[in-house]
Amino acid sequence: ERNPGAFIEQGCAAAGSVVALDNSVIWLADDFTVRRADGYVPMRISTHAIEAEIQKYSDVSDAVALTYTDEGHKFYVITFPAGGATFAFDAATQLWHERDSRDGDGDSLGRWRVNAYADAYGKRMVGDVTGRVGFLDHDAHDEFGFTVRGLLAGPPIHRDRKNIAMSRFEVDIESGVGLNSGQGSDPQAQLDWSDDGGHTWTDLKPWSGMGKIGQYRHRFVWRRMGQFRERILRLEVTDPVRRAVVRAHTEIDFSET
C-alpha cells in the first residue's frame, strides 16, 4: 500500500527481490544486505556470512525472491541466477539456510530449482527453472525424482584452542523412516568433519543407519574420532526419507596443552 510522503533511505539492488511478507516488505538493498521494513526503518536481517557471499557475485541485479508459509514458518527465499546460489530466511526462527538442487547426474544446479510459488487448488504450487509445475509436499523427499541432499553443519567445537579428544558423538534423528523398497529402504546418515575451520574435510565419512521402516529405537553413534583444537561437524543425508534432527551430544576429554 502506498503511503504518500513516506520515504526510506535505503536503495534496492534487484527489483525482483522485493516481496511482501507478514505485513512487511523484504528486499535486497544496494549495500548487499537483505532488509525488512519495520515501519519506515529498513532493518537488516541478513548475516555477515550471507552478505559476504552476496558480495562475491559479479551481478546481483537479476536476483529474484519468493515467499511461502510452511507449518507456521514464513520463508523469504532469494535466488541469485548469476551467482548460482539460493538463500532462505525463516522469519519464525530468524535463521538462514542455503538451498541447492541437483540434476539427473547428481550434479549441483548451483541454486534451488524453484522459480515461482502460488497457493492454488488447495496446494502450494511451484514452478521450476525448466518449466515444470509441481507442489510442495512433506511426503515427497525428492524434487521431480532428483535427489535432495540434506546437509547440516554445527558451530565450531573448541576449548580455548586446547587439545580435545572426542570419544563419542551421537545425533538424535527421527529413526525408523525407511521406505518399503528401493533407495531409502535402509537410509543412511553420513558424518564428516573439519579441523581447520572448514577449509578441508575428512575423506573418510563413517556411515550410520537411520533405521529401516519401523526401527524407531535406532541410534546414531560415532566413536573414537581423534584429537583436535577446533572442529566443525557436518551431517549429510541423501536418501529420499524424512530428515528430522532434534539434538546432538558428544563426549570429549580435555587436555591442558
Task: Locate each region found by the language model.
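Beta-sheet repeat architectures centered on beta-propellers
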Residues: 9-257
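A short beta-strand motif characteristic of beta-propeller blades
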Residues: 3-7
